Amino acid sequence: MTETRPNRLLDAIDTPSDLKGRSRADLKQIAAEVREEVVDVVSVTGGHLGSGLGVVELTVAIHSVFDTPDDKLVWDVGHQCYPHKILTGRKDRMRTLRQGGGLSGFTKRSESEYDPFGAAHASTSISAGLGFAKSRDLQNKDNHVICVIGDGSMSAGMAYEAMNNAGADRSRMIVILNDNDMSIAPPVGAMSHYFSRLVSSRPYRGLRRIAKKVVQPMGLESPARRAEEYLRGFAMGGTLFEEMGFYYIGPVDGHDLDTLLDLLENIKAMQDGPILLHVVTQKGKGYAPAENSADKYHGVSKFSVVTGEQAKGAGGPPSYQKVFGQTLAKLGETDDKICAITAAMPSGTSTDIFGKKFPDRHFDVGIAEQHAVTFAAGLAADGMKPFCAIYSTFLQRGYDQVVHDVAIQQLPVRFAIDRAGLVGADGATHAGSFDIGYLGALPGFVCMAPSDEAELARMVLTSLEIDDRPSAVRYPRGEGVGVVIPDLLKPLEIGKGRVVREGTSIAILSYGTRLQEALKAAEMLAAQGLSATVADARFAKPLDNELIERLAREHEVLVTIEEGSRGGFGSFVLEHLANCGGLDAGLKVRVMTLPDVFQDHDTPAAMYDQAGLTARHIAARAIEALGRGDLSAIERLASA
């Protein structure tokens, strides 16, 4: 529950309608209290802090002026939605944010009528908003559609595809560009430079006095220049957005609540065509530790409100991300053709480790996965050795490029697929569930998954040495298992797995980091006198057919397990066994995958338990297939 404090106006705000009729002074106090609440909440739950702090005044202004949920408010990505949730009937549940059974960290249709469209991936808001606008027109309704998109999301082509459509169609909608010059990493590319020019170009001296009436000082080097650029563009039609058919207003101070309220009231009354309001905000606004941090506290763990110091976990093995980055950087010392590519995630993927050593060979292309893939293909086509590091969930955005530009041409692009499997607090939108199936379907691809951090290091080297076709290594978020990574790495033999424990009646074939759970399951089975072989597949493509056939021939039961959806590794194994006659002698096969649902957020451990992919689940499936053994004993061992 949110703590009730004396004289706190926010306690009386249950829905946006409670903002109506409030004085400007009240709204400013409510904004200050929302900012304080966001800091308090995220200090307890962890999450995305800086983005929300930057849009507090904008959020209060939008909900004060417009009539949500009848007016449709679509947030891009959703990192900045915490103030919105506080004002739309969810403030009493904010401390469940990103917790199992609690509020999502993003907008979510099933959570509230004030979330008309779910978000988590970038650059979708304008397309969705245009859909709402056209639906409104076709149904002869009269509501407004407002999309809020950050400058980082404007590096993706989808945003411009939607603007091109909306501008040509003259659809009545409002796009608010939240320009904080900071997505997760600093924005890159020509569009980022364009926004910078918009807010810093040489002022027209004759407009200075008028400009200062539009935007009051906000602590920037020359605040009036932002408004002057708008006035210059208004008079001369001089902005990219106007060329695309939008009526452009801005840049304006996104923290000046009076200006925002006045502008939005005027914009609300405009009835012709699409409008783009360009607001300039400061990520982390109002909380000094965030303002002074390089990443503006984009994503944080629990922290002290007083000092801003984030909680640190107990020291443990290095993360898979760090192992990838360190291995690539080490290989880069002896091979100057290695390049690293990331789509706005240099620190998340740890390509920044490589980039610090070799800045000329490190490319952050912004939120542009399609471009990242084909850019890597171009590098590979001319003899370079690109590693394209992208989260599994985001690689989906560039799948056509993977097929058309990489796979068909058999170009040796090396994909480092981060955040494979279940990721925890970010939930279904960020789960890396599908890459095993969608890459395994492509002719010629080499698909690998390590069982531990040493295996990952070897697979990075193995990818480097594959120079005649594309390859991919998938690995999860989080720490390794604590094995030692040898100084001298040796590449793997392509398409060959390994047996890590020999047994007789049951075979467990693991692809990826569920191997540790498979070994625990083997111990549980051994406690009942059941002998289990445990094998590490290493490759989903090409399969180790010799190993699979041996496991089928020498055991009564074969269980496959993977951190991916149906239609992946287990399906490949089953298809091979069916075609080679491996099922003809009565082998019992059980395929263990992620369930056929989109799982809600929770801790990764809880999510894998819900998915049925822990040691006790593996042992239970083996006993069920074998037809002997004590299932209740497995439960007792698991809870011991």
From Swiss-Prot:
Catalytic reactions of this protein: D-glyceraldehyde 3-phosphate + pyruvate + H(+) = 1-deoxy-D-xylulose 5-phosphate + CO2
Binding, Mg(2+): 151, 180
GO molecular function terms attached to this record: 1-deoxy-D-xylulose-5-phosphate synthase activity; magnesium ion binding; thiamine pyrophosphate binding
Record CDD domains: TPP_DXS, TPP_PYR_DXS_TK_like
Residues involved in thiamine diphosphate binding: 79, 120-122, 152-153, 180, 287, 369
Transmembrane helix among keywords: no
Cofactor note: Binds 1 Mg(2+) ion per subunit. Binds 1 thiamine pyrophosphate per subunit.
Top-level EC class as recorded in UniProt: transferase
Keyword check for Methyltransferase: no
UniProt KW keywords: Isoprene biosynthesis, Magnesium, Metal-binding, Thiamine biosynthesis, Thiamine pyrophosphate, Transferase
Pathway(s) the chain acts in: Metabolic intermediate biosynthesis; 1-deoxy-D-xylulose 5-phosphate biosynthesis; 1-deoxy-D-xylulose 5-phosphate from D-glyceraldehyde 3-phosphate and pyruvate: step 1/1
InterPro entries hit by this protein: Dxylulose-5-P_synthase, THDP-binding, Transketo_C/PFOR_II, Transketolase-like_Pyr-bd, Transketolase_BS, Transketolase_C, Transketolase_CS
Gene3D superfamilies, A to Z: 3.40.50.920, 3.40.50.970
GO BP: any one term: terpenoid biosynthetic process
Its EC number(s): 2.2.1.7
Needed co-factor(s): Mg(2+); thiamine diphosphate
Pfam families, per database record: DXP_synthase_N, Transket_pyr, Transketolase_C
Function recorded in the entry: Catalyzes the acyloin condensation reaction between C atoms 2 and 3 of pyruvate and glyceraldehyde 3-phosphate to yield 1-deoxy-D-xylulose-5-phosphate (DXP).
Family, similarity comment: Belongs to the transketolase family. DXPS subfamily.
Quaternary context: Homodimer.
NCBIfam families assigned: dxs, PRK05444.2-2
Protein name per the record: 1-deoxy-D-xylulose-5-phosphate synthase
Organism: Hyphomonas neptunium (strain ATCC 15444)
Species lineage: Bacteria, Pseudomonadati, Pseudomonadota, Alphaproteobacteria, Hyphomonadales
